Design a protein with these regions (language model features):
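Substrate-binding clefts and catalytic carboxylate motifs of secreted carbohydrate-active enzymes
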Residues: 32-51, 56-57, 62-65, 86, ...
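An acidic-aromatic loop/edge-strand motif
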Residues: 36, 61-64, 69, 73-78, ...
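Active-site-adjacent substrate/metal-binding segments within catalytic domains
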Residues: 66-97, 101-110, 114-121, 127-130, ...
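Beta-strand/loop-rich accessory regions of lumenal/periplasmic or secreted enzymes
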Residues: 112, 159, 262, 626-629, ...
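Beta-strand-rich binding/interaction modules
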Residues: 121, 207-242, 249-251, 561-608, ...
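Accessory carbohydrate-binding/adhesion or oligomerization-edge regions at the termini
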Residues: 22-77, 96, 156-165, 230-233, ...
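Accessory beta-strand-rich segments of carbohydrate-active enzymes
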Residues: 24-26, 32-34, 40-47, 61, ...
Length: 953
């Protein structure tokens, strides 16, 4: 026995304080989680570090400890492998059992082992081999123990099951396949007569029913039931309940004035049951419970405590890059908080999660769909029957668990459906995720118009258990608003679950190169969060779309009186429990020139919210101070009753031309700017800046500023339209030099104006020259428009960052305009590939499209320049995000980008969500050009400042 294992044995003996008369004593043989492990002896049969005894941390996945071989579960599909890795693991641990435990019943418990498990104590097999990697199981080892002596625990683990249906259910799957003891191992010591298990049904009226399993009962037993609130100081009467000698019996009692559990108000109680004989406590157990009533009404909805619910949910894997499926309470609490931060109220899995995750869902408030594994194949009836019981027995008392899932996408066994109710006194429904089954339609990845007599056009309650697939930067937030609003029109809509919570990129202990984390290309890079919970842009989109406080769209103009229309989108909570505060922010005039200039608060305060029950819309009013319009944008932050930020909304207080006039620096210069033309070249020249245009193309071919050539060239090229130069006209407007270029095609004309101080103004008029009868000539635009504007070339090399005034800080898509807000955003250059740059994952990404662009200072050393928009609702295109390098054929990383590197656009493309854009909602679709004779055309006005010596002093 190695030193570390021996020390653990001594520690166990020295520190265990056994009180065997009443309570169950829990003795940890492993650590509680992978972040706090214990060390066991270990050997693996094949792969890395195989064939020799060493040590391993428990709990853990052995691959993450440097043993065996990594396998992804689509080994039989895209990965084209003949078979998965099939190594075996051998564990040993010496421990001492105190003599004082003799006469008690001792069981050993495994929280989860992948995949088949045989357990020996002192050389003897303690029970039948366990099959299935996601379930808690136990053995009675009393007869195998030596009390007061050293005992030897041996655990033989097969990564690949000997039962075909287990492999088909768990190991032919779209997830990583690991091996080992990855959840805790512990002993429980109980008196011979004891409460073995309870299954509780606690209703909203305070009534409680519990199925109690007893070991060695007798006629003269009673139970004393106590109820203790986790918060507050209420006291409840202790109830005395007579028992019979049956091993399974149902007890019932009731308390008045209990506080109910729901995800917005997750009130919890400790239920303490004391088993007494002749007035003496024989055994006692405690269970954390919540009082709530579930009502599943077909062709109507799902009700909690009498309220019809809508689940705003996401799917989640139990996963951490350095732990595989071995996680920790810290990670579980963090994950539930992040899910709640997105204003979600529900979560689903592909297998039973860690118990500490369910405990966090109970205490912080999430609905849970708890799933029997079976990715696309089900368990055989014999194996599945045992696993259903193990799953339900462990999870039945969690108030967060509201639905049982049997398998996924065909991975069910109809013979197991009734087994759930045999162990569940609450009679939760059993669904088959992705099927329209037994009155519940959970179809996966619906199109916007799904379907023929289903969803909004059908008669069954519907809640897609997977939708808005998030590969790379796809889905999740992109298109969510359309889908959600469309489905919400139906009274049969009960919610949905997006795929998926986080990228499943695992640390490869067997890799020696620069890459350290593996998501198997696009197969496991589906998260709204990175593997270490880095927030992608869709995180904030979901946060806004699913916020329980919703503002009616409104623009703030000079007539603004401080009022908004606000809807209470909670399920259970009154609007008046929400705290709301505002700030009016002002950008300094030097913002684009001095990186140290910070926005300042003009005025701030609180907004009183009225009484409004869920579903009601009310007018709210904020004070409008005399200096209100001195500010540039308004921020309103809502915080829920628990102190969690709901969202911060922003509104611009002025139009783009106001900001351009305010933010661009003007110098007094006596000398006039000049315009000259020489063959194919027009030169606009001021004292500091020279701009040269090609008269054949209309493109900038050179920008010179104080002996610096700034490579902002080869534009404006039209995007989404065609244009050819017709004529060039030079004029002098006072001290300003003017070049007007008229075009045939989509652009009517572009006017360039050089000011004496070096400022350059560009005004484009497009889509103007419609025919009187036939409308605009289609030869001059490119059909359906998903990209429209102008573009320029600019080298990416040397770019350091940008000071951006507009909506950010994340890039956006046509169908993902929520979750981005007005502000001054300092963005450092990065090359993050969304869902792939795991070694250097910097969010927000730098490259992409930015909405409501107002001003920017592009920092690129000697090539730096500034640009200001006089036009509202303009998108800035800032380079092109790098394509994912590791995706499999058929993956769709992003839509095509326009030519060039820096673009100014009125239309940008949408992002996919598993299905093609044509099957998404309205905001994902391309625009159509509509123009008639007499229209003014579309104007785009920009200011460029290529100067380097602007000094506000």
């Amino acid at each position: 026995m190695n030193l570390k294992t021996r020390l653990f044995s001594i520690f166990l003996l020295a520190t265990s304080s056994f009180v065997f008369a009443q309570q169950t004593d829990k003795i940890m043989l492993s650590g509680p989680d992978f972040e706090h492990p214990k060390t066991w002896d270990f050997k693996v049969s094949e792969g890395n570090n195989s064939g020799k005894w060493s040590i391993i941390e428990v709990p853990s996945q052995w691959e993450l400890q440097g043993f065996g071989e990594y396998t992804y579960g689509r080994w039989y599909k895209e990965l084209e492998q003949d078979e998965p890795s099939k190594e075996e693991g051998f564990y040993k641990l010496d421990f001492e059992m105190p003599a004082s435990a003799k006469g008690q019943l001792v069981t050993i418990h495994f929280g989860g082992v992948m995949t088949d498990t045989e357990v020996k104590v002192n050389g003897e097999v303690v029970g039948p081999k366990h099959h299935g990697g996601f379930y808690e199981f136990e053995y009675d080892i009393t007869e195998f123990l030596k009390f007061g002596e050293e005992n030897i625990l041996e655990v033989h683990v097969w990564k690949h099951s000997e039962i075909g249906s287990v492999n088909n259910a768990e190991r032919k799957a779209d997830w990583w396949l690991f091996g080992g003891i990855y959840r805790p191992v512990w002993l429980e010591v109980k008196p011979q007569t004891h409460i073995d298990h309870i299954a509780v049904d606690a209703q909203m009226d305070g009534s409680l029913k519990a199925v109690v399993d007893l070991v060695n009962p007798s006629e003269d037993l009673k139970i004393l039931a106590s109820l203790i609130p986790l918060e507050g100081n209420e006291t409840f009467e202790v109830k005395t309940i007579d028992l019979t000698a049956e091993t399974e019996q149902t007890i019932a009692t009731q308390w008045s004035e209990v506080k109910l559990w729901d995800p917005e108000n997750p009130n919890l109680y400790t239920l303490k049951l004391k088993l007494q004989k002749n007035g003496k406590t024989v055994h006692e157990v405690s269970e954390r419970i919540g009082f709530r009533t579930l009502d599943f009404r077909k062709r109507d909805g799902i009700y909690l405590n009498g309220t019809k619910i809508v689940m705003k949910g996401i799917n989640r894997h139990s996963f951490w890059p350095e732990g595989g499926r071995s996680t920790s309470k810290r990670i579980s609490v963090m994950d539930v908080n992040l899910i709640k931060d997105m204003n979600m109220n529900a979560v689903r899995f592909h297998y039973p999660p860690d118990d500490h995750f369910l405990a966090a869902c109970d205490s912080l408030g999430l609905f849970v769909l708890d799933e029997l594994a079976g990715w696309q194949n089900g368990y055989d009836t014999k194996t599945g029957t045992q696993l259903v019981q193990e799953m339900v027995d462990r999870d039945v008392n969690h108030p967060s668990v509201i639905i049982w899932d049997q398998g996924n996408e065909g991975g069910w066994n109809y013979e197991l459906d009734d087994d759930f109710q045999q162990h569940d006194p609450q009679n939760r429904i059993v669904i088959h995720p992705w099927s329209n089954y037994n009155g519940w339609d959970t179809h996966h990845y619906p199109t916007y118009l799904t379907g023929v007599h289903r969803f909004g056009s059908g008669e069954n309650v519907f809640f897609p258990t997977e939708f808005m697939h998030g590969t790379y930067d796809n889905g999740i937030g992109a298109g969510l608003k359309d889908f959600w609003e469309h489905y919400s029109e139906s009274p049969l809509f009960a919610g949905g679950f997006m795929w998926v919570y986080s990228d499943e990129a695992v640390l490869r202990t067997d890799w020696t190169g620069e890459e350290k984390f593996d998501s198997k290309g696009n197969l496991a890079s589906d998260g709204v969060l990175g593997p270490h919970r880095e927030k992608e842009g869709s995180f904030y989109t979901v946060k806004e779309v699913w916020a329980p406080v919703q503002f009616k769209p409104q623009a703030i103009t000079e007539t603004f009186d401080g009022s908004f229309l606000v809807t209470n989108a909670y399920l259970f909570t009154n609007l008046n429990t929400v705290k709301m505060n505002y700030r009016v922010m002002e950008a300094g005039a030097e913002t684009m020139y001095n990186p140290n200039t910070k926005a300042t608060v003009v005025t701030s305060g609180a907004i009183d919210l009225p009484h409004a029950v869920p579903g009601e819309t009310r007018k709210i009013t904020m004070p409008v101070a005399a200096n209100f319009f001195k500010g540039d944008w308004l921020e309103i932050t809502a915080t829920d009753q628990h102190g969690r930020e709901i969202y911060t909304w922003t509104w611009a207080l002025h139009k783009a031309d106001y900001f351009a006039d305010k933010l661009i620096y003007q110098e007094a210069v006596k000398k006039s700017a000049k315009a000259t033309q020489d063959e194919n070249l027009v030169t606009l020249k001021s004292e500091k800046v020279t701009l040269k245009l090609n008269t054949k193309t209309g493109y900038i071919i050179e920008v010179n500023s104080q002996k610096r050539n700034i490579p902002f060239v080869n534009g404006p090229k039209p995007i989404g339209m065609k244009a050819e130069v017709e004529k060039v006209t030079l004029t002098q407007d006072g001290k300003n030099a003017v070049c007007r270029i008229d075009y045939n095609g989509g652009i009517d004309h572009i006017t360039w104006t050089m000011y004496p101080d070096g400022r350059v103004h560009m005004e484009m008029i497009a889509l103007k020259n419609a025919g009187r009868n036939s409308g605009f000539d289609g030869a001059f635009y490119e059909g359906d428009i998903d990209k429209f504007g102008i573009t320029f070339d600019f080298p990416e090399e040397g770019v350091e960052g940008i000071t951006l005034f507009g909506r950010g800080p994340y890039h956006t898509w046509r169908n993902r305009l929520q979750g981005i807000e007005y502000g001054i955003w300092e963005k450092e250059y990065n090359t993050t590939i969304t869902g792939e740059s795991f070694e250097n994952m910097i969010y927000p990404e730098f490259k992409g499209f930015y909405a409501n662009f107002l001003a920017g200072n592009l920092q690129a050393g000697d090539n730096s320049f500034k640009v200001f928009s006089e036009s509202d609702k303009l998108f800035l295109r800032l380079f092109t995000p790098d394509e994912a390098q590791n995706g499999f054929r058929g993956s769709h990383f992003q839509p095509s980008f326009p030519p060039g590197n820096i673009s100014f656009m009125y239309e940008i493309p949408g992002q996919r969500a598993f299905k093609p854009l044509s099957q998404q909602g309205p905001s994902s679709q391309p625009s159509n050009i509509r123009i008639k004779s007499g229209d003014d055309g579309i104007s785009m006005k920009l200011w460029f400042d290529f100067r380097t010596d602007v000094d506000f002093k």
